[in-house]
Swiss-Prot record:
Location of the protein in the cell: Secreted
UniProt xrefs under Pfam families: Defensin_beta_2
One GO cellular component term: extracellular region
Stretch forming the signal peptide: 1-15
UniProt record, GO biological process: defense response to Gram-negative bacterium; innate immune response
Keywords: Antibiotic, Antimicrobial, Defensin, Disulfide bond, Secreted, Signal
Similarity-based family: Belongs to the beta-defensin family.
Covalent S-S links between cysteines: 23-50, 30-44, 34-51
Physiological role: Has antibacterial activity.
Name of protein: Beta-defensin 121
Length: 76
């Protein structure tokens, strides 16, 4: 019985892992190196990379040419 209790205690202690620091609105994880399927966009507080699935990274909008929009308004 004592052996079973000791085995259960050791198993529970080994099963606990340290919590992973999350970033990017809980969509990313702070790691030193990202997985192949992840990208990093910002750095975490611990200078680790914030590894995020690319589908959660915002796409930069394309800038429109300001000269063409000015020409169409100045022709009035």
């Amino acid at each position: 019985m004592k052996l079973l209790l000791l085995l259960l205690t050791v198993t529970l202690l080994l099963a606990q892992v340290t919590p992973v620091m999350k970033c990017w609105g809980k969509s990313g994880r702070c790691r030193t190196t990202c997985k192949e399927s992840e990208v990093y966009y910002i750095l975490c507080k611990t200078e680790a990379k914030c590894c995020v699935d690319p589908k959660y990274v915002p796409v930069k909008p394309k800038l429109t040419d300001r000269n063409t929009s000015l020409e169409s308004t100045s022709a009035v």
